């Protein structure tokens, strides 16, 4: 009995102590070995102390930042989270994260690689604990490269000796059109973006158009176009393929690349060489993964700080380095016997010490699109580096311009109330006119069945549309909204930022969108109708098999189809150019001019869209009695006349809704534009929906401006559908 009481007391005490442990929620986006190491750290921490209990939540990387900015201000976010440092400026400005106290900063500095500390500094304050870092280094195949190049001249000499472009072999491979992978050359030529420490402009803006940047872009273009040692239009997948197949001896890439290298490939890594022309090292961007503590009232700051101290300790760093295969920020760990012989991690450490921390300024994110556009112009020879960078600078200044002036919402609220009263009056009038109340009392059953659909429409269509339209009257930056009235609409419709002939203007994009929709729908209907007429004929054998095969393009997810066609249009390795070359024709740079890029998009979307029209037309054709065509045949009508005067008029009632639906789909076909041409060249093949996306997510998160774009898209489609409907009724 005494033993039973003793164990009950122990149980109650342990329950009480566990209940007293406060929870620390940590968000992360780790996968694989990194996640396993973090889970082990959590387990160790929870076992070694009884004051806090850490809980980890894995959030997909693509959704991470948006979830944070939405959840933390509302008190629904984590106590701490692990993320790359480049968003620190945004989060510090919006009050999402808490700055570190001076004692913690001094302690971290003792045993951290200096550049990883610098990356976490914003406005002279430190905002996080450095955990690990990523930068690009030089990967090389040890079976092809016997000596590590110490300079770019040596690297080019090795690359030239191993290049055979006619057979698809290149001495060096990297994504030359990417700003991230081109940054080592920009810094190697002493270039800058003016967000770097010690190189900032007084006005805090970027400086893309400096001579050193131009020299770097010229050098990259020479590697790709003149020397031909780097593949054109290189993508991440292509770089991996070339390296694994032994068709590229050297690659500039980051630690994520190791997971893509085949197991039987002999390789090693080295620090990027010195630029022979300048004597400067190739300095890549440094990205630091930091442990950041959220800042709102309910955050368990003490618990979050306690876990931060543990995972940044020597023990925590060793687990992350050895088991998680992370390049950790803790200096002393590289002297440990477990890592002292690890060449790969030590090379990444050496590269980190000379790399340039990517700026965490909110305006840094604005430079990617203008700089990428300048790079692509130079690579395809459309403009000189100097002119391309001048255009990039102007584009940056437009994207980062101040928000419109705030306006009083009083007048707009009055207008909204008047409109609401008019709408309510119209609604009441319609209810009385159609005796809705009486009908509801007499026959409630039909309305009972209609209610779920009506409720879903209100919840999923009308409310989001109303919210989206309302956002169009606001301007957003760094988590803050301010009412600006019709300013966004005025800026778009008056083309205040860009000339009408500029690819980034609303009217140019509208013209491209209308042409894109018209050409696609014409091809969808023409090809679909032609195939339907063939499949209808009884003399065609295996019609069922053909129908099934022709529906496949429509059944495959469109993003998969888009990526396949994107690869087929590659200049050097694509199947389309392979066919052209087999016929003795020159290969085409499909995305270097408007018409070829537009044709590539249209081809891809036609492949996706014709099956829908074929199925619709085939169903309508099978409902047309053959006797009508036989009678026309007896009257002497030929095939074309029978189709024109008998078949097509009977098809129109079925085709018209399909054409309207297909037009709306094509008008908003974001995936094809985004994945195939990416809007190239210079945004010329963008359509309205892809432009709205860029304003929302790539140009300082201008949600109000993007919402105004979306509202205008809705108005255009509404006018189109109503016009088409009236024309169809008039003709019928």
Walk through the language-model features, giving the residues of each.
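Extracytoplasmic/periplasmic substrate-binding proteins
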Residues: 29, 181, 218-303
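A structural signal for short loop-to-beta-strand junctions that line the ligand-binding cleft
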Residues: 79, 107-143, 170-171, 278-284, ...
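Hinge/lid segment of periplasmic solute-binding proteins
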Residues: 84-137, 147-158, 185, 268-272
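Extracytoplasmic/periplasmic solute-binding protein
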Residues: 125-131, 136, 156-205, 248
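Glycine-centered hinge/linker elements that transmit conformational signals in sensory
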Residues: 158-159, 201-232
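C-terminal lobe and pocket-closing loops
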Residues: 257-266, 275-370
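Conserved C-terminal helix/tail region of periplasmic/extracytoplasmic solute-binding proteins
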Residues: 353-423
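A structural signal for multi-pass alpha-helical bundles of membrane permease subunits
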Residues: 445-732
């Amino acid at each position: 009995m005494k033993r039973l009481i003793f164990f009950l007391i122990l149980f109650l005490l342990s329950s009480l102590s566990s209940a007293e442990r406060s929870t620390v929620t940590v968000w992360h986006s780790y996968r694989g070995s990194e996640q396993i190491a973090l889970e082990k750290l959590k387990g160790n921490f929870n076992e070694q102390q009884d004051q806090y209990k850490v809980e980890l939540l894995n959030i997909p990387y693509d959704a991470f930042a948006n979830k944070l900015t939405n959840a933390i201000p509302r008190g629904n976010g984590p106590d701490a989270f692990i993320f790359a440092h480049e968003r620190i400026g945004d989060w510090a400005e919006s009050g999402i994260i808490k700055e570190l106290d001076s004692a913690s900063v001094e302690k971290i500095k003792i045993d951290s690689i200096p550049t990883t500390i610098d990356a976490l500094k914003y406005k002279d304050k430190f905002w996080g604990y450095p955990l690990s870092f990523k930068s690009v280094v030089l990967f090389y195949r040890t079976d092809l490269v016997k000596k590590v190049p110490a300079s770019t001249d040596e690297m080019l000499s090795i690359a030239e000796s191993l290049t055979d472009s006619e057979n698809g072999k290149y001495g060096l491979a990297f994504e030359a059109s990417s700003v991230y992978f081109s940054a080592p050359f920009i810094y190697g030529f002493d270039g800058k973006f003016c967000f770097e420490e010690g190189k900032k402009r007084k006005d805090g803006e970027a400086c893309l158009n400096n001579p050193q940047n131009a020299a770097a872009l010229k050098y990259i273009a020479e590697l790709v176009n003149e020397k031909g040692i780097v593949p054109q239009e290189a993508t991440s997948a292509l770089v991996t393929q070339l390296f694994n197949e032994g068709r590229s001896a050297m690659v500039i890439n980051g630690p994520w690349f190791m997971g893509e290298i085949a197991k039987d490939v002999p390789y090693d890594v080295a620090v990027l060489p010195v630029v022979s022309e300048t004597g400067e090292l190739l300095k890549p961007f440094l990205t630091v993964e930091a442990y950041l503590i959220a800042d709102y009232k309910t955050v368990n700051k003490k618990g979050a700080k306690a876990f931060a101290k543990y995972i940044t300790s020597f023990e925590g760093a060793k687990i992350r380095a050895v088991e998680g295969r992370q390049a950790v920020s803790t200096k002393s760990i590289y002297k440990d016997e477990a890592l002292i012989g690890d060449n790969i991690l030590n090379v990444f450490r050496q590269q980190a010490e000379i790399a340039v921390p990517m700026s965490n300024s909110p305006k840094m994110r604005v430079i990617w699109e203008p700089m990428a556009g300048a790079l692509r112009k130079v690579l395809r020879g459309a403009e000189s580096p100097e002119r391309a960078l001048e255009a990039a600078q102007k584009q940056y200044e437009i994207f980062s311009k101040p928000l419109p002036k705030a306006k009083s919402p009083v007048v707009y609220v009055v207008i909204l109330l008047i409109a609401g009263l008019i709408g309510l009056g119209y609604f009441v009038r319609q209810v009385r006119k159609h005796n809705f109340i009486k009908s509801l009392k007499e026959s409630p059953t039909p309305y009972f069945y209609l209610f779920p659909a009506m409720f879903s429409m209100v919840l999923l269509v009308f409310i989001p549309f109303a919210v989206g339209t309302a956002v169009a009257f606001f301007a957003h930056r760094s988590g803050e909204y301010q009412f600006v009235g019709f300013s966004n609409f005025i800026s778009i419709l008056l083309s205040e930022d860009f000339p009408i002939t500029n690819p980034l203007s609303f009217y140019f994009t509208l013209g491209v969108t209308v042409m894109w929709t018209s050409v696609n729908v014409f091809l969808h209907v023409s090809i679909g109708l032609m195939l339907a007429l063939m499949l209808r004929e009884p003399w065609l054998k295996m019609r069922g098999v053909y129908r099934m095969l022709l529906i496949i393009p429509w059944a495959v997810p469109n993003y998969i189809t888009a990526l396949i066609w994107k690869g087929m249009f590659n200049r050097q390795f694509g199947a389309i150019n392979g066919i052209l070359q087999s016929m003795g024709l020159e290969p085409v740079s499909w995305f270097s001019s408007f018409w070829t890029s537009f044709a590539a998009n249209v081809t891809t979307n036609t492949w996706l869209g014709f099956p829908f029209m074929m199925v619709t037309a085939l169903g309508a054709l099978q409902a047309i009695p053959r006797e009508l065509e036989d009678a026309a045949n007896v009257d002497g009508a030929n095939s074309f006349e029978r189709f024109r005067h008998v078949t097509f008029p009977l098809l129109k009632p079925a085709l018209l809704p399909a054409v309207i639906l297909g037009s709306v789909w094509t008008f908003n076909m974001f995936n094809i534009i985004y994945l195939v041409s990416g809007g190239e060249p210079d945004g010329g093949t963008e359509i309205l929906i892809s432009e709205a996306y860029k304003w929302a997510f790539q140009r300082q998160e201008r949600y109000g401006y993007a919402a105004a774009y979306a509202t205008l898209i809705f108005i255009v489609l509404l006018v189109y559908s109503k016009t088409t409907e009236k024309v169809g009724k008039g003709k019928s």
